Amino acid sequence: MTNIQTQLDNLRKTLRQYEYEYHVLDNPSVPDSEYDRLFHQLKALELEHPEFLTSDSPTQRVGAKPLSGFSQIRHEIPMLSLDNAFSDAEFNAFVKRIEDRLILLPKPLTFCCEPKLDGLAVSILYVNGELTQAATRGDGTTGEDITANIRTIRNVPLQLLTDNPPARLEVRGEVFMPHAGFERLNKYALEHNEKTFANPRNAAAGSLRQLDPNITSKRPLVLNAYGIGIAEGVDLPTTHYARLQWLKSIGIPVNPEIRLCNGADEVLGFYRDIQNKRSSLGYDIDGTVLKINDIALQNELGFISKAPRWAIAYKFPAQEELTLLNDVEFQVGRTGAITPVAKLEPVFVAGVTVSNATLHNGDEIERLNIAIGDTVVIRRAGDVIPQIIGVLHERRPDNAKPIIFPTNCPVCDSQIIRIEGEAVARCTGGLFCAAQRKEALKHFVSRKAMDIDGVGGKLIEQLVDRELIHTPADLFKLDLTTLTRLERMGAKSAENALNSLENAKSTTLARFIFALGIREVGEATALNLANHFKTLDALKDANLEELQQVPDVGEVVANRIFIFWREAHNVAVVEDLIAQGVHWETVEVKEASENLFKDKTVVLTGTLTQMGRNEAKALLQQLGAKVSGSVSSKTDFVIAGDAAGSKLAKAQELNITVLTEEEFLAQITR
C-alpha cells in the first residue's frame, strides 16, 4: 500500500469515527471546523488520485446521476406491519394473548419499548460492511430502490464501524425529518417562492422519492434503526434491545428513548412518559412500539397474517381530524399583526376539544385555497396552537364563502398595511388601537418580562376597556380605590396586585428591555443588549452601527431598536416608568477569558427563577460555553433550577458538577 493510500484510509477512518460520534452518540469529540478541514483534505487528495477513490468514502454521499424512475427491489424477508392498540385495555389484551400462548412464561415479561417514529420505513443492506442497497418498505414484499438517496443521509454510515463486518447485514429503520430541519426547509421554500410541505412526514417522503439524489442531499433527513432483517456471517445478540445496542456500536443510529420495561405496568408507564415528552422531542411520533425483548420468545410466538404476535404499536390519540370551518375572525396582536383565526365546528383532537385554529396570514389562506364552509384537516401537536393543514376541496359546498382579508383594523378601524417582503399585515393604529394596547401591556407584565404576578390578562383588559391605563407606566399609578371598583377584584386581590407592582419595580436591565416590546427583540437579544451597553442611556443613544455590533443583532433588528428610541412617545413612557420607581442594579458580566464556563459543556435543567431558559443559554454562549440538551460524560456543568428531573439524576450518577441558579449567577457576575 502506498503512502497516499495509507493517508486516504486513515482520513476516511477518522472521518467515519467523527460521523459516528456526531450522528449516533450525539457526543462529538472535535468541533465542526476540524471535521470540515479533514473532509476537504480527503476530497482534495481523492481529486488528485482518482485511482484510489472508493464508493464508501465520506465524500461519496452525493454524486449519482438523476434517475428516470425507481426500480423495484424484492425483500428477501418481508417487511411486516404491526397490529395497533388504542387503549390500555387493548394493550393488556395483547399481553394476555402472549401469556396464553407461551409454554414457559417468564415472570415478568420483558419488553423493548420504542417511540413510534412518524416517517418512512426503509431497508438498508450492507455487504462486507459496505452500504450496497436501500429500499422503501413498499407493500412489505417489494419496495423501490432508493440506494442513491439513502447514501446522502448524513447519519447513515456508508461503511460499518467494525473491523469484522457481517457478510450481509440488513438494517431496518425509519427515515424522518426533525422539526428544526423541516422549519428550515419550508422557510427556504417560502423565500424562493417554492412549494412548502404540509408536515415533516410528507417532506421526508418527498425527499426520499426524489429522482435526483443531489436534491435529497440538501434535505435534513435522519435514520433511526429499529431492527435487523438478513444477518449472515455474524452471531447476533439474543435480545432485541442488545441487538439495537450492537447496531449502535457499529455505527448505526438508534433512538435514544428506547427503554427496557418489565411487565405491563412499566410498559404503560413508558407510554405515558413518551406521550408527555412528545412535544419536546424535536421530531414527530404517533405512538410507541412495544416488543417482546427475548428473540427466542419472539420465534416461539411467530406471526399471524402480516403482523408479528410479539409486537404491537400502541398509538397516541389522533393529532389530526376533519371538521368544518364555520367562520374566520381577525385578531390584532401587540405589534399590530393581523392574524386570521378559524372558528371551527368543535372536534376532539389529541385529547382536547378544538374550536379555534390559526390561519397565520393572508398568504396561508391563499395557499390553502380555503373558504368558509369547507371541510378542513385540523392538526394539534403538543402545546402547539392548532392549525389547519389541509382542505378537502372536493367536499366544498355550493354556499361556501370566500375569506376576505380586511383593509381596516377590526378593533380601531385604522388602515391595515403590509410592507413588501413581509408576510404579516399590520394595523397602523399603534397605541391608539385598544387591542395593541392590551397585548403590549400583557407582554409587559408577563413572567419573562417584568414578572408582575398579581396583574393578569383579564385585569388588564378591564383597565384598558375602562380607559384607566394607556401605557405601562400607568400600571404603577393604580391605587386600592381604583382596583376595588373593578369586577371580581376584592380588597385582598387588589392589595396583592399592588404589592406585585411594587416588587416588580426592582428588575434587571435585560428584563426591562424585553418588557418594552420592541419588535423582534426577544429575551436573548434583550440580554445581549443589556450586557453590551450596560446602561439604558447607552442603548438609547446608540447608532445603527453600534447596535449591529451586538451579538445576534442584524440590520433589521438594529433598525427596529433605533426607530423605537426616536419615537418621542416611547421615550416619554420609559422616562415615566423610571419616574415611577422602576430601577435595576448594574451587573457586569465577566469576560469570556475570565469565567468558569469558557470552553465548557453546560446543560440547563429545571425552572430558572431569575431568567428564562433562552436568556441563560444566550448568556452562557456569550461566556464561551457550549450549551447541550443532554447530559453525558463530556458534560462539565449542570445548572439545576426548580423541579430538575432526569438530567439532574444523570449528572449526579456521573459525578458531574451541579450548580444551583444562585451559584451560577454568582460565578458570572462581579
Swiss-Prot record:
GO molecular function annotation: DNA binding; DNA ligase (NAD+) activity; metal ion binding
Broad EC category: ligase
Pfam families to which the protein is assigned, alphabetical: BRCT, DNA_ligase_aden, DNA_ligase_OB, DNA_ligase_ZBD, HHH_2, HHH_5, Nlig-Ia
Keywords: DNA damage, DNA repair, DNA replication, Ligase, Magnesium, Manganese, Metal-binding, NAD, Zinc
EC id: 6.5.1.2
Domain BRCT residue range list: 592-670
Binding positions for NAD(+) per the UniProt entry: 32-36, 81-82, 114, 137, 174, 291, 315
Residues of the active site: 116
PROSITE patterns: BRCT, DNA_LIGASE_N1, DNA_LIGASE_N2
GO annotation terms (biological process): DNA repair; DNA replication
UniProt superkingdom: Bacteria
Xref: HAMAP family: DNA_ligase_A (MF_01588)
PANTHER family cross-referenced by the UniProt entry: CHROMOSOME TRANSMISSION FIDELITY FACTOR 18, DNA LIGASE
NCBIfam families: dnlj, PRK07956.1
Protein name: DNA ligase
Protein source organism: Haemophilus influenzae (strain ATCC 51907 / DSM 11121 / KW20 / Rd)
